[in-house]
């Protein structure tokens, strides 16, 4: 973009800072320089950039897979930089932002929400009072002041969803006490001393606070429960509030605040001044209009400007450059790079317990390019052994020409064959967990986030 004078900030020109700094920072990453590591010819990279710049509207877009690897933060930053530099941010046809009826974004008095404190064992940075999940097992297993001795989980399954799941499994066994708010006895909740099953599904009301913020149009929709909850059942919000009440040591009578009260207040004080009753009178929701340009008003920087080149991220570019040089040397012991995938019908582990969603051909396979498979003398659907630094699993190989040579791929959320799991449907499709191969020591060094992709592995026929 810089080489072809393609910078077109458009309406963002007056409040975007750091363009020249950005130009200098990426000068070493020319199409010719990155062609080998990306596997994309320099001419093709140039064509993509030219097409992007020439398009009337365009969006560069990345989601979970981009985020959960060793340079996730850097990648998401550069995606935004590309959209901003080409005039595709806060403009029709480009990346735009919602004006939700229930606002969850606020200007903070203290904008510093990163690395205010660190994890006890490895010193990983916090973000918004949360620690990277890669630190979870070690914080339970490592003795000393501040060791985690008790745990509450809520509708989560870290044994299958965090790196080095076997270590996580072992860590949960060492807890003094564990409570799970869940409707399933799964790979994680089987360790709990107490399981508190909340009312769920069609027994609950719903207002999607998160996805109204991420929508392609401004809308608001409330869904009341279709059925009353069963006798003596509690909603999850009742359980959370009562637990918090008791943790505080309060003994007075306690009456939980229903989410409808919070929602109604937020709607009435929001930009549209609607209320919950209006939503209840509109069962299909209320259309609040198309997305509109909202910069600089919607920016949360203190000076209401886009800071294109923060120093923290510029420094991480140097790490990327060093990694790029090092990655040219292939590992002899672990020559293949493992990445993850999610299928539309089973993208989370709990969906495997639905017969309608899990039915069909086996999706827990190792995707591998046929040329790599032939080198390893692996037939299509042959069982293979995959080994990383932390573990070994066995599963069928599936030839796939969409895979890049040297890269293999496994799905998320399987591994239901562990003892005492009470998921009748899922156990019939147990598969193996990709997170028994992922490594809690592999991180996005900038944030400490787990790197679930680009895990180096060895593959052999069984």
Locate the predicted segments by residue.
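A glycine-rich phosphate-binding loop feature that marks nucleotide/adenosyl-phosphate handling sites
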Residues: 16, 51-52, 95-106, 255-270, ...
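Flexible glycine/proline-enriched surface loops and loop-helix/loop-strand junctions
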Residues: 29-32, 61-66, 219-228
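Long, contiguous, secondary-structure-rich segments that constitute the structural scaffold
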Residues: 224-279, 351-367, 371-462
